[in-house]
């Protein structure tokens, strides 16, 4: 078995008709493949969009609504209808499904993050298939994850999946938009995600990318940095899920980081909210970036913001003003500033176990998406 634990993400277009309504036929195609993989011994998670599409017609809307309240109401109705369809199909094959609705707050709060990961682990151990969506009905725009590509990558990283498969209506990442550029070539294997890759996907003001591809590159970055390989492939092929599971998919494959980030480091890098800024001298910069050591109080050159003990802060080089990483502090800002003023600044400020260096890929996540 090439990949045992797999997260599949299907977008709204993969399970709806051209008029935006839910397609039971498309859902059945997906669940039949999931059932076959489940019976073959794979552990599966499905991240599925489509709640609004499933619900807007039942509320009497003639087309997909655009107002936030209308979309949230449609999602409230549609999520149940969507789960009903998935549950009925999977249960006919003797498979238990579970609904999990997540929001950005579930990742930002460390305890909730750990609890969600624990629940998912139990479900997979008990051979259930978790079906996950963002909690659209209660999420406010400013606090949303924003897209299920990102959510699927966060889940894949959280449970240390063996593979993330992003199913879409295009068979991978191209050098240009294949719908308008006949010279566009698909990239079958991507080893490093950089500015050029982002531009191909439609970032940095580019007009070359295809709709939705940029969020998939963001998702691939999160997953690959966490040690999870990623496929972007078309959901239109009848055996797309099975082919991806055996590393035979017709799509773009993203090679993961050789040593993926542990769960604690993932949380620091991608989800923890920075409460302040700390500037360090050259000696501390070298110790953090080159030697993998803890940040000592004696290396601090300046503090900005108000934070408490065990809050996350961003650490910058005093010389270059560039971010070096993020970490959880052992002193609040007030206590640290008092120690610095008294010239009794001794001890560890950020332990190396609570520190993550900002790699070029993580820097792209912070600046480009």
From Swiss-Prot:
Catalytic reaction list: L-glutamate + ATP = L-glutamyl 5-phosphate + ADP
Broad EC category: transferase
GO MF annotation, one: ATP binding
SUPFAM superfamilies (alphabetical): Carbamate kinase-like, PUA domain-like
Binding site for ATP: 9, 168-169, 210-216
CDD domains: AAK_G5K_ProB (cd04242), PUA_G5K (cd21157)
PANTHER family linked to this entry: GLUTAMATE 5-KINASE, ISOPENTENYL PHOSPHATE KINASE
Name this protein carries in UniProt: Glutamate 5-kinase
Species of provenance: Neisseria meningitidis serogroup B (strain ATCC BAA-335 / MC58)
Name of the coding gene: proB
